[in-house]
């Protein structure tokens, strides 16, 4: 908690900011002036410009006494049991979600911190633990890989209530990927009950293993379709795509307005348009420069589609674009695949515009950002063939009900 929230909490609990005062609904002794709502101002522990405990940026949070440091005592220690020298039957919380880490060179990069609260709360071994947190840990999130693995293998996870739209919990608040609240039960050991909640009216419930995949598939209705793809033995597109920043150009790179005289230049595609750079500046994937490349934007369109009405369907990705030989990209884009001829590149670009591949992507997304792992359930096929959704539905033996679900969830690509 911060100083302000500690004062507000005491006023709510005791009708007084100072529980040892005569105005407190329950008067604590002078030795406990804060009652049971303890606040102690502490400082971050800086190492190489970051807090050792929460990863906050020193430039942002190395502040004077007049400003809140947001160095939350509950997570700024190595032994939370010594801090909380008491037993807890129940822990309930809505922890802080993130703090600026000074990354990206813009000062707006943020690092999740909510998982530290969850992990430390577990260390206290309460009978029950429930917290509401962003759902980005399901399949992504900066620095959340170990946390995701720990949560997916925790057999004490009894219930996850998943809201794909954060506004169903927090009206007017858009959190890309939605939010969830979970019940962790110390005495429980088994599969987890997953509740898909949408529009405050519809809840789809199933009980299943959390660790079936290396990411959490939140949509209960998608599981059977994913199983059918995996049973087919077809390759995964994730094993054949390129990682971010395939040529070594960061998002801010723009190049020159025209080719440089006397220099072997290639075209650079950035979020600002087109420029020209010396081919010598390409730092990796040199063999791909002369090929046709199929690219998409690296983020989910429309601010993560947080305002999309599910009845209208989701796009999931931007439209695919084909780049010619001697055209490269900055890390504002993802390079999905390269081809020696334009016909196969065109076939693949049209394939990625189909509903089925985007449906299979959709269930691995929990934030605005797209990465290689989001293609792990997208089939990698022979692109000498021009595929259709109908061909894919037949290939993976989808039922009429499953086909209708895919068709209703994903909108046509313009």
Locate each region found by the language model.
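Extended, charge-rich low-complexity interaction segments
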Residues: 52-58, 62, 188-200, 395, ...
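C-terminal substrate-recognition regions of SAM-dependent nucleic acid methyltransferases
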Residues: 82, 86, 166-400
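Short amphipathic alpha-helical surface patches that mediate protein-protein
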Residues: 134, 353, 408-411
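SAM-dependent methyltransferase catalytic region
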Residues: 1-159, 165-169, 178, 182-191
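Class I S-adenosyl-L-methionine
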Residues: 1-26, 31-32, 60, 374-414
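Hydrophobic alpha-helical segments
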Residues: 103, 311, 411-413
């Amino acid at each position: 908690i911060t100083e302000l929230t500690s004062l507000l909490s005491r006023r709510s609990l005791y009708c007084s900011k100072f529980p040892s005062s005569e105005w407190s609904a329950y008067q604590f002794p002078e030795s406990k002036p804060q009652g049971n709502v303890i606040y102690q101002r502490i400082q971050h522990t800086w190492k190489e410009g970051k807090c050792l405990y929460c990863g906050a940026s020193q430039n942002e949070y190395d502040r004077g006494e007049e400003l809140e440091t947001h160095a939350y005592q509950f997570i700024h220690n190595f032994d939370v049991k010594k801090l909380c020298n008491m037993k807890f039957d129940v822990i309930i919380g809505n922890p802080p979600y993130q703090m600026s880490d000074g990354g990206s060179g813009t000062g707006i990069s943020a690092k999740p911190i909510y998982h530290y609260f969850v992990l430390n709360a577990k260390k206290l071994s309460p009978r029950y633990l429930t917290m509401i947190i962003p759902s980005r840990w399901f399949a992504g999130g900066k620095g959340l890989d170990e946390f995701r693995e720990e949560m997916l293998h925790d057999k004490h996870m009894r219930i996850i209530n998943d809201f794909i739209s954060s506004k169903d919990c927090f009206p007017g608040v858009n959190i890309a990927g939605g939010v969830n609240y979970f019940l962790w039960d110390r005495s429980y050991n088994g599969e987890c009950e997953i509740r898909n909640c949408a529009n405050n009216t519809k809840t789809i419930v199933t009980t299943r293993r959390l660790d079936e995949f290396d990411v959490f598939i939140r949509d209960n209705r998608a599981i059977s379709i994913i199983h059918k793809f995996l049973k087919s033995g077809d390759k995964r597109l994730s094993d054949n795509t390129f990682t971010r920043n395939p040529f070594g150009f960061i998002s801010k790179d723009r190049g020159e307005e025209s080719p440089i005289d006397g220099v072997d230049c290639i075209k650079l595609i950035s979020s600002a348009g087109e420029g020209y750079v010396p081919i010598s500046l390409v730092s990796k994937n040199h063999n791909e420069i002369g090929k046709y490349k199929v690219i998409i934007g690296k983020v989910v369109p429309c601010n993560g589609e947080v305002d999309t009405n599910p009845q209208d369907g989701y796009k999931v990705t931007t439209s695919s674009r084909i780049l010619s030989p001697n055209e490269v990209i900055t890390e504002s884009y993802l390079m999905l695949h390269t081809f020696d001829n334009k016909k196969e590149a065109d076939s693949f670009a049209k394939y990625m515009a189909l509903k089925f591949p985007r449906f299979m992507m959709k269930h691995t997304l929990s934030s605005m950002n797209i990465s290689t792992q989001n293609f792990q359930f997208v089939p990698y096929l022979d692109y000498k063939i021009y595929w259709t959704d109908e061909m894919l539905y037949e290939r993976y033996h989808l039922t009429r009900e499953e086909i209708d679900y895919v068709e209703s969830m994903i909108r046509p690509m313009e």
